[in-house]
């Protein structure tokens, strides 16, 4: 974005307001970021695609056809350098010009000026564009009954510098799961489905290991993958989960059986209690029902290629919220920091292993895959309501601003000594778009969901089990249902992202955009694109409802 607006270089720092002394004592006294701590990270334009910038959409194998570096669209066109706030202070202190808006100001002991100048900086960076191998570690335990149905569990193993919290805190939980499952296998136990454990390399530079593996094996994964379960950093606190809403009921059932090590109650009950105290109004019904809602996933970890590119149901799970987390992506993400400020008793790594282990084992041994459609129906209905309301909000905002410009309100309150200030531009008023296709699709989805829930409840009443042949036919539909939420041509301006319900923001990065093709067109006031995308997204939702109808039909057969 900086380059698009004319910047020729970019220096990034983490302000102490975000995770430094504004939050608490800095390391080593406390856990927050000190003045020498710089936050590393990838500045690849991953909202276009993740993975190797030179091989978009294909695996980065030795003989893969590669783009030239200058032609890779995710590689930034300007130099970028992260520094600490201690190093940023003299640069910011030397800036002149007008004061920054209040929401741009941090916690450094200086007035925050916008510039330009009079300070000048010489930015010199060296780049190494050599190709180097990365190493994914993959372990496979074949299923005894359904070997062609795969449950995949992953966490990355690379880190910036020491990486005690990110990724090791999550990786050790996965390794312990794998060790325990290995002991079961040694005793003669066999899973029904194939279980794959993966430790991904190159996550930090751009989800390289997971993306290239997923792209290399794309056809196999679309055919055989059931669910991908991801974890990353982990620390003391509350259970958090995001992912495919068809897995929401399944996750709630599993975490009822995991005990929180600090409180001695289930991690579900603890998360529900947090929602009761701090949750938004629309979450209180979930809290009363003693359930947690899965968050929709954008990007930022290794679930991205599975969910967003291949349409494979995915989860991202972990614990956190109570540690002092100021070491992120720095040299201070060390063992010492972790044992003092993240998870001193190593209890929440055990909790993560127990949680993910339950999810893994229940998935690989389920006679019928645990996808349910009611939570997805509720979520999509909410997302459609949001984009309709967004359009109304944008229309009102434009009408209000334009009227104030006509009435010279901004001119009347303008401070003549602030010469940098200019009145905001006029806004294009949103037309009254036709959302009927989306609303009708939601109605179709609701009807299909209700029919499936009724049929499944009847088929399993009184503890009845489905005949094997019927269960197999049903599973074949359930495991690929998420793929019907994708579109082969992908999202506007980024065909790699094919999921029509969840995507990272094109301009906002990791954070999720739901119904992205419609929502982002509205946010950019591109009414023509929004009009074109509404029926396409509606058709995708109806296609998903069609898969539910197929599943219902299977349950109705004798």
Where are these regions (language model features)?
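Metal-dependent peptidase/peptidase-like ectodomains
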Residues: 33-99, 146, 202-339, 345-349, ...
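Glycine- and acidic
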Residues: 119-123, 153-168, 194-198, 236-237, ...
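Short, solvent-exposed loop/turn and secondary-structure capping segments
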Residues: 13-14, 19-27, 93-94, 149-151, ...
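C-terminal amphipathic alpha-helical interaction region
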Residues: 467-558
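Soluble metallo-hydrolase cores and metallopeptidase-like ectodomains found primarily
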Residues: 50-165, 179, 183-187
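A conserved hydrophobic secondary-structure block that centers on an alpha-helix together
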Residues: 1-35, 144, 148, 158-160, ...
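Alpha-helical metal-binding/catalytic segments enriched in His/Glu/Asp
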Residues: 1, 137, 153-207, 212, ...
């Amino acid at each position: 974005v900086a380059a698009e607006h004319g910047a020729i270089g970019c220096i990034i720092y983490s302000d102490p307001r975000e995770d430094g002394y504004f939050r608490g004592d800095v390391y080593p006294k406390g856990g927050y970021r000190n003045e020498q701590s710089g936050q590393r990270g990838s500045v690849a334009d991953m909202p276009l695609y993740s993975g190797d910038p030179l091989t978009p959409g294909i695996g980065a194998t030795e003989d893969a056809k590669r783009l030239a570096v200058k032609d890779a669209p995710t590689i930034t066109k300007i130099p970028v350098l992260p520094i600490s706030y201690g190093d940023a202070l003299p640069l910011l202190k030397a800036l002149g010009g007008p004061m920054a808006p209040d929401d741009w100001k941090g916690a450094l002991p200086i007035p925050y000026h916008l510039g330009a100048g009079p300070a000048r900086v010489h930015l010199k960076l060296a780049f190494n564009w050599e190709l180097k191998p990365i190493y994914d570690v993959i372990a496979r335990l074949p299923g005894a009954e359904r070997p062609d149905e795969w449950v995949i569990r992953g966490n990355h193993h690379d880190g910036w510098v020491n990486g005690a919290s990110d990724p090791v805190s999550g990786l050790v939980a996965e390794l312990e799961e794998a060790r325990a499952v290995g002991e079961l296998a040694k005793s003669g136990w066999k899973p029904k489905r194939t279980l794959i454990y993966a430790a991904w390399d190159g996550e930090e530079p751009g989800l390289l290991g997971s993306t290239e593996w997923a792209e290399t094996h794309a056809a196999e994964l679309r055919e055989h993958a059931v669910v991908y379960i991801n974890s990353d950093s982990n620390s003391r606190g509350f259970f958090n989960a995001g992912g495919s809403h068809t897995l929401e009921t399944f996750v709630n059932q599993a975490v009822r059986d995991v005990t929180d090590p600090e409180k001695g109650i289930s991690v579900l009950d603890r998360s529900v209690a947090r929602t009761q105290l701090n949750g938004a109004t629309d979450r209180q019904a979930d809290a009363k029902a003693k359930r947690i809602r899965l968050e929709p996933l954008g990007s930022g970890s290794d679930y991205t290629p599975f969910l967003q590119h291949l349409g494979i149901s995915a989860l991202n799970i972990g614990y956190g919220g109570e540690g002092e987390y100021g070491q992120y992506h720095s040299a201070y993400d060390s063992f010492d920091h972790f044992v003092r400020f993240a998870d001193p008793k190593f209890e929440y790594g055990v909790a993560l292993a127990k949680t993910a282990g339950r999810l893994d084992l229940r998935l690989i041994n389920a006679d019928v895959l645990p996808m349910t459609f009611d939570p997805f129906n509720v979520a999509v209905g909410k997302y459609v309501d949001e984009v309709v309301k967004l359009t109304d909000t944008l229309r009102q905002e434009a009408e209000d601003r334009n009227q104030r410009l006509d009435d010279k309100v901004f001119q009347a309150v303008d401070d003549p000594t602030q010469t940098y200030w200019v009145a905001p531009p006029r806004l294009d008023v949103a037309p009254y778009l036709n959302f009927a296709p989306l609303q009708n699709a939601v109605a179709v989805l609701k009807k299909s969901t209700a029919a499936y829930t009724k049929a499944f409840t009847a088929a399993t009443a009184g503890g009845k089990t489905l005949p094997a042949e019927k269960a197999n036919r049903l599973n074949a539909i359930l495991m690929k249902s998420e793929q019907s939420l994708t579109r082969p041509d992908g999202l506007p301006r980024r065909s790699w992202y094919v999921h029509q319900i969840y995507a990272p923001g094109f301009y906002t990065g990791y954070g999720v955009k739901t119904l992205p093709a419609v929502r982002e067109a509205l946010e950019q006031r591109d009414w023509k694109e929004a009009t074109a995308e509404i029926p396409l997204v509606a058709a995708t939702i109806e296609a998903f409802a069609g898969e539910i109808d197929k599943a219902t039909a299977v349950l109705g057969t004798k």
